[in-house]
Amino acid sequence: MFDILMYLFENYVHSEVEFLVDEDELTQELTRAGFHQSEIIKALSWLENLAELQEGDKPYLCNHAQHSFRIYTQDEMDKLDVECRGFILFLEQIEVLNVVTREMVIDRIMELDESALILEDLKWVVLMVLFNAPGNESAYEQMEDLIFEQPDGRLHS
């Protein structure tokens, strides 16, 4: 399923191609690209649920103290190792994520089929969430820089 999400993000969203495609057409294209029907359905459902998070009717997306500390459940810790949880905290500290977008990221991660997530995959989920969260354009650009900038090995310029 994650491969399909990456395919869609790279071919439609990130390439700035107009994303006004009929779901049936999209399913056919993904099938032609070699993806299995069951995985396509899961990926499209994942994206639909991401869009629904914008409505903010989930209790964990409302009424948070701005400087609250996130305690992860055991299931979340099983899926997100220490490195991934640390990266989420880092993103909050540099204000790429706020309380709401952090919870959206965790929600979407928990819906992925993967039993554990690697840091690179987490970065892409964050980018997908920020892209779909209105008002987070600056955070999206900052996250894009974190993903695509390659360190040149110098500590000082």
From Swiss-Prot:
InterPro entries: Smg (IPR007456). NCBIfam families: PRK03430.1. Belongs to the Smg family. This is Protein Smg homolog. It comes from Shewanella woodyi (strain ATCC 51908 / MS32).
